């Protein structure tokens, strides 16, 4: 167990620094290794501090996760408080018990660590020794019965900020969820909360009838929801679930007198106004679980698979193959057990293919996108229903689907982009798709593109103010038609030239002297002259070499335009050449 200690009265929080072991592989559901690395925390050191001026000592401990060795859940923490706690708990329809509000001036507020939305995981028993797992409403009520003494609570902080603004507008009517409206009869006592179970075991079968849904365990919730068909799964296609699950009940300690309850030591109204201003921006909330959308009958796109139950839900939806672009380190960072998910895929007979792409890396996406589309085409040709996923579902997975529609179905990039973004909330890297498109066409054209320009290049010269700067090169009428650079202020001069795919030599003429730039790559020509060189675009390959380009002061931007009929034909040919370079049996590039 790794510890994080905070002593009341000290000015700083002492943090442990765990070691990191790198090297675990990231495997596909059928046992094939594609790429990716994993991390495991090996250990940490604890530090203690004391303040003799204060009687109350607050101890905060970061708890290790479950029984898995050498790992810890940094979202979990333990805090010891005196009674009364001053915490109002809420039970949500998904079976979670979380902090609903904190009383002003209470011990919980003085701790300055507990936040609204933190899930209650464990609590110490009446003797104050053993930590007991909180599974249901009954376990929490047992803890709240005690009037005095100190209690240790283990809480878990959500990955994403809890939507406190929705709690502010809830009324008493919102807490009448299913209260007395649905009866539940069972012979299985394990479906009821702990405070309703008999202490002695009977010889016969006893029946139970419940009219308030707050007395269920998570297992009972799941059974009730399936029978009543009222449960809207977090993976429901094209439907955004509410930010928080409906509340079943709200409860706290029985303390005489009234007190003011709050949601934190910050101006909530200003926070809500800031959230309103940010509406329309995409943000990933891992706590909402896996989200997906149906694009076609055979293609689904969405966020990452988090649990084995997600695999079961996908299998029930008819998914037979998963194309995953999330890396092993990403999965570790989000607390996802990749091995258990791969095992669940094998159990459900769902093919899992892992091909990691770096998140928010336009260059890595551009280089790997052709093979991604090739893998997707191979899966579709084998009559698979494919779920394309990454971490958020906003970028890499949706970019793959858009590129597939653009390259394989002769749909324009604009139409494919609008179609996918209209069905699934996402914002893929559109320039990366356009850049990969020209790389594919260049593959058929032997690295060159004869036709309308494909890229816009801004040539940059850093010299002295007052200089006359001219640009000359392969693209200026065979070095005979110099282009005058524009002074942008200070030592910076710029010239924008629209070029086709290819490799170009160039130089600058500064006040009549021919010179090359020291801030851009250089190369000697056949005559021994040192020239600057720029490579516009690249050639797609089924085995991409992910080598970052050399540092260059010049700026290259891709041009997105409507393809000519000849370009569309060459694009379709190149994309299928990549796809046919993928082995249909092993689903990896042919040797």
UniProtKB/Swiss-Prot annotation:
Cell location: Plastid, Chloroplast
Cellular compartments per GO CC: chloroplast; chloroplast starch grain; chloroplast stroma; starch grain
Gene Ontology biological process terms from the UniProt entry: starch catabolic process
Disulfide bonds: none
Enzyme class: hydrolase
UniProt GO molecular function: carbohydrate phosphatase activity; phosphoprotein phosphatase activity
Transit peptide: 1-61
Protein name per UniProt: Phosphoglucan phosphatase LSF1, chloroplastic
């Amino acid at each position: 167990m790794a510890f994080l200690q905070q002593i009341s009265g000290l000015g700083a929080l002492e943090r442990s620094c765990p070691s990191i072991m790198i090297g675990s592989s990231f495997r596909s559901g059928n046992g094939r290794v594609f790429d990716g690395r994993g991390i495991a925390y090996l250990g940490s050191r604890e530090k203690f501090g004391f303040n003799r001026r204060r009687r109350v000592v607050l101890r905060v401990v970061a708890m290790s996760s479950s029984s898995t060795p050498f790992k810890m859940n940094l979202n979990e923490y333990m805090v010891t408080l005196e009674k009364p706690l001053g915490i109002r708990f809420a039970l949500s329809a998904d079976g979670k018990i979380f902090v609903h509000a904190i009383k002003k001036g209470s011990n919980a507020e003085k701790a300055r660590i507990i936040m609204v939305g933190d899930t209650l995981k464990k609590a110490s028993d009446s003797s104050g020794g053993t930590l007991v797992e909180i599974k249901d409403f009954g376990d929490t009520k047992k803890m709240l019965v005690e009037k005095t003494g100190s209690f240790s609570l283990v809480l878990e902080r959500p990955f994403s900020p809890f939507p406190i603004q929705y709690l502010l507008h809830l009324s008493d009517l919102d807490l009448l969820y299913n209260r007395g409206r649905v009866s539940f009869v069972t012979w299985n006592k394990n479906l009821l909360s702990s405070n309703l179970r008999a202490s002695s075991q009977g010889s016969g079968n006893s029946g139970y009838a419940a009219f308030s849904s707050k007395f269920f365990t998570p297992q009972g919730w799941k059974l009730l929801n399936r029978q009543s068909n009222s449960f809207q799964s977090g993976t429901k296609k094209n439907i955004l679930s509410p930010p928080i699950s409906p509340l079943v009940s709200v409860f706290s300690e029985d303390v005489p007198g009234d007190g003011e309850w709050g949601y934190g030591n910050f101006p909530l109204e200003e926070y809500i106004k800031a959230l309103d201003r940010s509406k329309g921006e995409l943000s990933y909330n891992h706590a909402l679980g896996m989200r997906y959308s149906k694009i076609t009958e055979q293609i689904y796109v969405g966020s990452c698979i988090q649990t084995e139950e997600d695999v079961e839900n996908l299998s029930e939806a008819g998914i037979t193959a998963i194309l995953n672009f999330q890396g092993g380190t990403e999965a570790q960072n989000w607390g996802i057990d990749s091995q258990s998910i791969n095992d669940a895929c094998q159990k459900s007979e769902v093919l899992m293919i892992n091909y990691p792409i770096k998140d928010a890396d336009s260059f890595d996406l551009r280089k790997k996108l052709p093979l991604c589309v090739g893998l997707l085409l191979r899966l579709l040709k084998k009559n698979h229903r494919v779920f394309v996923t990454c971490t958020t579902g906003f970028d890499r997975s949706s970019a793959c689907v858009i590129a597939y529609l653009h390259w394989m179905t002769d749909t324009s990039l604009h139409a494919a982009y609008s179609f996918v973004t209209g069905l699934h909330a996402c914002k893929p890297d559109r320039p990366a798709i356009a850049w990969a498109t020209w790389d594919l066409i260049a593959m058929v054209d032997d690295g060159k593109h004869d036709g309308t320009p494909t890229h816009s290049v801004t040539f940059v010269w850093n010299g002295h103010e007052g200089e006359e700067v001219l640009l000359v090169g392969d693209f200026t009428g065979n070095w005979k038609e110099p282009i005058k650079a524009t002074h942008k202020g200070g030592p910076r001069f710029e010239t924008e030239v629209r070029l086709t795919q290819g490799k170009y030599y160039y130089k600058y003429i500064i006040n009549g002297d021919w010179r090359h730039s020291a801030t851009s790559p250089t190369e000697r020509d056949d005559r021994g002259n040192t020239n600057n060189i720029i490579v516009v675009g690249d050639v797609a390959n089924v085995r991409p070499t992910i080598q970052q380009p050399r540092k260059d002061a010049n700026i290259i931007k891709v041009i997105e335009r409507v393809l000519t009929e000849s370009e569309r034909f060459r694009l379709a040919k190149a994309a299928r050449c990549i796809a046919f370079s993928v082995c249909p049996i092993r689903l990896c590039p042919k040797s």
